[in-house]
Amino acid sequence: MAPCATGESAAMHLAGASKTSTINASVLHGPRDLRLERRTIEDPSIGELQVAIHTTGICGSDVSYYKKFANGDLCACMPLSLGHESSGVVVAIGPQVTGFNLGDRVALEVGIPCGQCGICRKGRYNLCKRMKFRSSAKSVPHFQGTLQERINHPATWCHKLPDNISFDAAALLEPLSVAIHAVNRAEPTPGSSALVIGAGAVGLLTAAMARQSGCSTVTIADVDQGRVEFAIAKGFATHGYVVERPLHSSPSCSSMYSPSSSGTSTPLDGVMTPASTLSVSSQFDYARSLAADMLSLTASDPSIYSDEEEADGVDVTFECTGKEVCMHTSLYATRAGGKVIMVGMGTPVQTIPMSVAHLREIDILGIFRYANTYVTGIKLLCASERARKAGKAGVSGGGCLLPFLDQMVTHRFKGLENADRAFELASKTVDPEGKLVLKVVIEA
């Protein structure tokens, strides 16, 4: 069920007729046509809070809109403010809102379901057909994103933050919620093995959540060596695998990798054929070989697998890229009776070796955004932060504590006038100085 904006603290309500004021907003008018504009904003209405946006993280879908004025099949048809990974401060409180005070720090859950349909009543409100999601072109008129100085947002979907959670970590609650939802769908048992394909923000957070849920080994794979090394060094995953980028001519054959002391695999010699030029059967062969290489990182460790049959695959694979070849690899890398969780949204129509899943009873589960996750995310962040400040690390309950998420923010831009620079950088994996780019944030 949806959270409620109720509580014991006395709220300060606005009285009298609604007033308007002007704010700055970053508005996308077309591909790479980002403009700083003045907009009017009214006082919050019944059930709303007015939130001054402090921090907004840039998501891959935002970058897609910025580059193409579209995200997959969703094409924007009017000016759109981007941004949906956000935290801020309550600056005004509308009528009939309780549980909030001016100055409260909040994280924003930006998907607004109808709350009335059968799927909402069942608690799976992320699947509501009438969902309005900020920065998405799905609803018309578009539901404007958070790259604005202030927004009015339903209090029900504003989550109060404890003092020990930073604005950066609070903004990351949105992609963390995707990871929480993915792991909730997977339901791994303590001691399970997991593979995460894709080491972007969602992949990193999914790996961290897999460890937190009790998975004893979590291997993360990506084409970017810097991201894989970050995942291992910062405790997001236990093992790492670097996949050779297509069309690279010097390092690497996909089946020739050497584990390093850091727990990361790096390419040796050879040349890889781009998957797009292969026949379907050859693509499957390539994915099968890639899966075998990934599994070889942990297959010989007796502390992980009790018998040879278990070494045939991981208990659960989280596919966080949406790429067809990665879905193939996920199926081949998962043991009989295991699960593949489709996290990334990419190629809408794919040719999949379904018999691999059918004959080995591999469950394929999709996820879409998240539901009922923010309270869990806040509790996990609090526990991690308390342990960090106490100089402690390690396990909590059934698994590991979350890593310090603030370290995922590698680049910061101040002011909405710099949003275009932020989007250009967010589309890269390294900055002009050669430093790793993970999460880029904009402070309004």
Q: Which functions belong to the PLM regions below?
A:
Residues 2, 233, 245-285, 321-395, ...:
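Glycine-rich phosphate-binding loop and adjacent beta-alpha segment
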Residues 196-199, 211-327:
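Adenosine-nucleotide cofactor-binding segment
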